[in-house]
């Protein structure tokens, strides 16, 4: 069982989408179920509407799930599991205040040591715990042995008990911490493999320790994906526009192109242009590079152009939404436009009213002739016919003609454009 477990706290990051895609691919390859779990226990940071947005984005990428969970709905199980650990003396109530802990952290900092919980409340007698009326958290006792696990990308990893520490699993408001809720949910939902970003590596031994303490002995496998760097080689920030999947989609980049690029990023693929369905046949999670991958927007745009060309004409016409059969013309314009947004702008420039500027007179002459001109198969025949009838020459012929046909003074060679624009010439002459 594989899962994707986003939080509804902001726009979906491309790193999260990459994890979703990889989990989905591996689930399909292993013929296993795929879980979508919304981790919404951080109520203060949750944003209304983001849960639905996550589902909408996954649907756009053709990522389907067999099971859907809301983490906060498992709260009763989180509390039951925490109580079980306390009753078995594997966890304990900690009454240390934030101020007390902060003072100890400052002292450790001054001494040049890493702060570790000193066990102040671990050995409190039961009667002392019962009689104490202060707010408390629940801490899981640190493991007594080295925690080891295998990562498909990073290999064998191990963590010593002192580096895991006795960590908090339940807050004073009786809600679970991220690691506890995540570990319990993975256990309850029979997750067998976790693919996520490498920023979660330090969480893995804690989650392994939680499940082991609860007597869960089913093996879990992992793959921690390297971080995505920006074009300057620095970890990509959520503040950078193109780190947002929503921004990429709104910019006119196709879901299929984004998926193609994210699968290829930091990975050796048998070909450069492919679909998600094709990738399922050959993708190997263990072949993903350990090194951070640098995001290249230009490369993504190049891939997007290829995916636009791959779209069926009727589907592209629906996307362009101009009530015309413009797909062949739009695909021709991928030499200048890299996104659906840019293509729409190109098409609108062609089919909207135009500013003729200094060529007002010449454009009027040409438009009258173009209304009924014979649409020759060959551009040279078309051009010569129009030259002869208009008596215009050079710049005063070609510039006005380009404006009428494209709405711009610059663009592709008219001879190259002609086969794609030919059937619209009579219409353009009447705009």
From Swiss-Prot:
The keyword Aminoacyl-tRNA synthetase applies. GO terms for biological process: glutamyl-tRNA aminoacylation. It is an enzyme of class 6 (ligase). ATP binds at residue 238. One of its GO terms (molecular function) is glutamate-tRNA ligase activity. A motif ('HIGH' region) lies at residues 6-16. It is found in: Cytoplasm. Its EC number is 6.1.1.17. One of its GO terms (cellular component) is cytosol. Keywords: Aminoacyl-tRNA synthetase, ATP-binding, Cytoplasm, Ligase, Nucleotide-binding, Protein biosynthesis. It holds the Pfam family Anticodon_2. Belongs to the class-I aminoacyl-tRNA synthetase family. Glutamate--tRNA ligase type 1 subfamily. Monomer. This is Glutamate--tRNA ligase 1. It comes from Campylobacter jejuni (strain RM1221).
């Amino acid at each position: 069982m594989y899962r994707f477990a986003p939080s509804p706290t902001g726009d979906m990051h491309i790193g999260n989408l990459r994890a979703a895609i990889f989990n989905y691919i591996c689930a399909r390859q292993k013929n296993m179920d795929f879980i979508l779990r919304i981790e919404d226990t951080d109520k203060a940071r949750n944003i209304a509407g983001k849960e639905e947005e996550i589902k909408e984005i996954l649907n756009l990428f053709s990522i389907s799930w067999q099971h859907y969970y809301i983490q906060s709905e498992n709260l009763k199980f989180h509390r039951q599991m925490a109580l079980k650990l306390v009753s078995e003396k594997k966890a304990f109530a900690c009454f240390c205040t934030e101020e007390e802990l902060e003072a100890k952290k400052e002292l450790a900092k001054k001494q040049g040591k890493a702060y570790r919980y000193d066990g102040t409340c671990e050995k409190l007698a039961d009667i002392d715990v019962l009689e104490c009326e202060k707010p408390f958290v629940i801490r899981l006792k640190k493991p007594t042995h080295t925690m080891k696990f295998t990562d498909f990308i990073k290999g064998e990893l191990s963590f010593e008990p002192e580096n895991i520490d006795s960590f908090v699993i339940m807050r004073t408001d009786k809600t679970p911490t991220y690691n506890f809720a995540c570990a319990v949910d993975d256990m309850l939902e029979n997750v067998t493999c976790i693919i996520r970003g490498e920023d979660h590596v330090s969480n893995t031994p804690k989650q392994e320790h939680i499940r082991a303490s609860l007597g869960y002995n089913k093996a879990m496998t992992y793959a921690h994906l390297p971080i995505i760097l920006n074009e300057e080689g620095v970890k990509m920030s959520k503040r950078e526009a193109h780190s947002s999947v929503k921004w990429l989609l709104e910019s006119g980049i196709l879901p299929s192109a984004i998926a193609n690029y994210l699968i290829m990023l930091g990975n050796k693929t048998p070909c450069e242009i492919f679909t998600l369905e094709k990738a399922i046949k050959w993708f190997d999670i263990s072949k993903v590079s350990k090194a951070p991958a640098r995001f290249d927007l230009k490369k993504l745009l190049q891939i997007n152009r290829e995916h636009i060309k791959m779209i069926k004409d009727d589907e592209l016409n629906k996307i362009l939404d101009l009530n015309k059969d413009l797909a062949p013309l739009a695909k021709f314009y991928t030499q200048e436009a890299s996104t659906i947004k840019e293509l729409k702008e190109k098409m609108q420039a062609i089919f909207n009213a135009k500013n003729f500027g200094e060529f007002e007179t010449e454009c009027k002459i040409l438009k009258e002739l173009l209304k009924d001109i014979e649409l020759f198969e060959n551009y040279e025949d078309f051009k010569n016919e129009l030259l002869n009838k208009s008596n215009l020459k050079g710049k005063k012929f070609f510039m006005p003609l380009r404006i009428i046909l494209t709405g711009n003074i610059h663009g592709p060679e008219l001879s190259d454009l002609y086969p794609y624009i030919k059937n619209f010439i009579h219409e353009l002459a009447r705009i």
